[in-house]
A protein has these predicted regions:
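Short glycine/proline- and aromatic-enriched beta-strand/turn motifs that initiate or cap beta-hairpins
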Residues: 30-97, 200-201, 216, 221-226, ...
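Outer-membrane beta-barrel strand-turn architecture
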Residues: 34, 73-77, 120-124, 158-162, ...
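Outer-membrane beta-barrel "beta-signal"
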Residues: 184-194, 256-264, 293-309
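Hydrophobic, lipid-facing positions within transmembrane beta-strands of outer-membrane proteins
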Residues: 63-69, 110-116, 132-136, 148-154, ...
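Repeated loop/turn-to-beta-strand initiation elements of outer-membrane beta-barrel proteins
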Residues: 77-81, 124-128, 162-168, 194-198, ...
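Outer-membrane beta-barrel translocator/channel fold
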Residues: 89-100, 199-288, 294, 299
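Transmembrane beta-strands of outer-membrane beta-barrel pores
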Residues: 44-50, 85-93, 134-140, 170-176, ...
Length: 309
């Protein structure tokens, strides 16, 4: 879910690294706000995965949109809390997918979600963040009651100097009949006035925070390249080829990004990349694997506009 990163002084930007649901943070900077201050952030991201070949024949592609909004309030000098909402929609098209019997395993996938952010500032540069969230992930026609993902990201970071913050955390989630636990490594390292190494993503049910190398040549433009891993599950249509089953998409998206700061609080991100090590999986309603199919490197594109006030 969208939430402030545990890292201080992060820039605000967002984009979906792939149709799988990777995304950049669309929240206000994690720097401490004045007590009583409230920041609202909204974003919208159209996304696309171009044609990718399937190992046993056929290909597939998809388009979608991600919309999000968050509100963060600084209650005391050391405590801030916020709420965020998000909705993802994906539309998939399959051409002669032999591994799935020539029939599209899924078509329209929805992922609405809601999350909280709780952030504590300690002494000597320490910060702790808890981000509980709940999400419904389902194909059109599926039972939403059987499509719930829930859990939390917990992280602690320490600022060692004005140019270096490091931290560790974990994501713990129950994702449609499967428990997932994964580590999170937090980095915000200003290598020079123009170069920085940082986490581009908000960790959540689909995976960790990734890593990005950022170049800032001036006040308006920013260029970056990075990657992460992503895996997400969703409940399938009750009347589809695998009634009430579970679909899964796994991949390692790598990308380049160009971002333009349109004003003090608005930003446009243009992203192009490729999804590597991709796999599609279909399980039956009892979570027994039926089909696992690798797909070729898939070109991915995304555009995000976001603003805060």
């Amino acid at each position: 879910m969208h939430a402030p990163s545990p890292m201080p002084a992060r820039p605000v930007h967002a984009f979906a690294a792939a149709i799988a649901g990777a995304f950049l943070a669309t929240s206000p900077s994690a720097q401490t706000l004045p007590v009583g201050a409230t920041v609202v952030s909204v974003s919208i991201t159209p996304i696309a995965q171009l044609d990718a070949g399937l190992d046993r024949g056929g290909d597939f592609h998809g388009t979608g949109v991600i919309a999000g909004a968050s509100v963060l309030r600084q209650f005391t000098p050391s405590f801030a809390a916020g709420i965020n909402v998000r909705y993802d929609h994906e539309s998939w098209s399959f051409a002669s997918p032999a591994a799935f019997g020539g029939t599209a395993p899924w078509r329209n996938v929805h992922r609405p979600g809601l999350g909280l952010t709780l952030s504590w500032e300690g002494g000597s540069g320490w910060r702790a963040v808890a981000m509980p969230s709940v999400q419904w992930a389902y194909e059109s026609g599926a039972s939403t009651g059987d499509a719930v993902n829930w859990g939390a990201v917990l992280a602690v970071s320490k600022t060692y100097a004005k140019d270096l913050t490091l931290g560790l955390g974990a994501g713990v989630f129950r994702e449609i009949d499967e428990n997932r636990v994964f580590p999170i490594v937090l980095v915000d390292w200003r290598l020079s006035d123009r170069w920085r190494l940082a986490n581009p993503f908000t960790a959540g049910p689909a995976g960790g925070a990734g890593l990005e190398l950022i170049h800032t040549p001036g006040d308006r433009w920013e260029f970056a390249g990075g990657g992460t891993w992503r895996s997400y599950r969703f409940r399938l249509d009750r009347d589809g080829p695998t009634p009430g089953g579970i679909g899964e998409k796994r991949q390692v998206p790598v990308y380049v990004r160009a971002s333009y700061k349109a004003g003090p609080a608005s930003r446009l991100d243009l992203v192009a990349g490729v999804a590597l090590a991709g796999r599609l999986v279909v399980n039956d309603r009892d979570d027994r694997e039926l089909v696992s199919e690798d797909f070729d490197p898939a070109p991915i594109l995304g555009v995000t506009f976001q603003t805060r006030f």
